[in-house]
Amino acid sequence: MESTQQMVSSIINTSFEAAVVAATSTLELMGIQYDYNEVFTRVKSKFDYVMDDSGVKNNLLGKAITIDQALNGKFGSAIRNRNWMTDSKTVAKLDEDVNKLRMTLSSKGIDQKMRVLNACFSVKRIPGKSSSIIKCTRLMKDKIERGEVEVDDSYVDEKMEIDTIDWKSRYDQLEKRFESLKQRVSEKYNTWVQKAKKVNENMYSLQNVISQQQNQIADLQQYCNKLEADLQGKFSSLVSSVEWYLRSMELSDDVKNDIEQQLNSIDLINPINAIDDIESLIRNLIQDYDRTFLMLKGLLKQCNYEYAYE
């Protein structure tokens, strides 16, 4: 039979579920939104760690196994546990653990007075009332029976000194502090307003400068477009005039066609390219003229003629 082990496991699982319910209900009362799965996971991780690291789970399950073995007629483990609990070494070890816990509490700021008071008294809240009930524990009862409780009359007979508070002077002090704070806030606010106005003025001035520059850019763009259109018209007129003049010349058709092809290759849309094309055409004409002059010069020499520039 493992009924005791199953009961202990059930108690541990129920404790975990109670911890989850306590955590979620506390969050709901505080008005904090939460994810149930996340709370469940975090509480389970912490609960399992504490139960395993402290050895509480293994201790409870071990005692449950011992009880089940005793119920099944196996008393060896129970006898060993009884002997272990009554051994002087075990008692010394328990005293050592208790002393360690006391020193740990002292290091955390929980002194002896607080430990004794917490062990002797507990407070029970009354629902719906601001008052509460102070309950004495069994330790307090034992101390009373042993005569370890005394009444200090000095706390009862001592008269409470009532300090007279000058609320008017306090109010005046608070009013002065409030006025001083109000003045500082007002000065800071006025300074901030002045800075904001200055920033706005600078912004408006910058906007005006940008607007003027944009207008100038638009005027320059318009002028450039007009200049480009005029140049395109001039180049187109130039090409037409040269073509008309070329047709009136007594040159051969091949020469005319060659010059017309060069004229038609001029880019009339982009003035920069048009200037480059005209420069190339003029260079070609000068080169043709130079070749013609050299041919004429050679013919004159062959005919024994001389030439001179006038």
Curated annotation (Swiss-Prot):
Region of interest (Dimerization), ranges: 147-203
Keywords from the named record: Coiled coil, Host cytoplasm, Host-virus interaction, RNA-binding, Translation regulation
Family membership: Belongs to the rotavirus NSP3 family.
Protein function: Plays an important role in stimulating the translation of viral mRNAs. These mRNAs are capped but not polyadenylated, instead terminating in a conserved sequence 'GACC' at the 3' that is recognized by NSP3, which competes with host PABPC1 for EIF4G1 binding. The interaction between NSP3 and host EIF4G1 stabilizes the EIF4E-EIF4G1 interaction, thereby facilitating the initiation of capped mRNA translation.
Alphabetical list of HAMAP family matching this protein: ROTA_A_NSP3, ROTA_NSP3
Major site of localization recorded for this protein: host cell
GO cellular component: host cell cytoplasm
Quaternary structure and interacting proteins, as annotated: Homodimer. Interacts (via the coiled-coil region) with host ZC3H7B (via LD motif). Interacts with host EIF4G1.
Coiled coil: 163-234
Region (Interaction with host ZC3H7B): 167-231
Gene Ontology BP, a term: regulation of translation
Entry-linked SUPFAM superfamilies: NSP3 homodimer, Rotavirus nonstructural proteins
Residue ranges of the region described as RNA-binding: 1-146
Subcellular localization, as worded in the UniProt entry: Host cytoplasm
Single annotated GO MF: RNA binding
Pfam assignment, any one: Rota_NSP3
Protein name: Non-structural protein 3
Lineage: Viruses, Riboviria, Orthornavirae, Duplornaviricota, Resentoviricetes
Region (Interaction with host EIF4G1), start-end ranges: 205-310
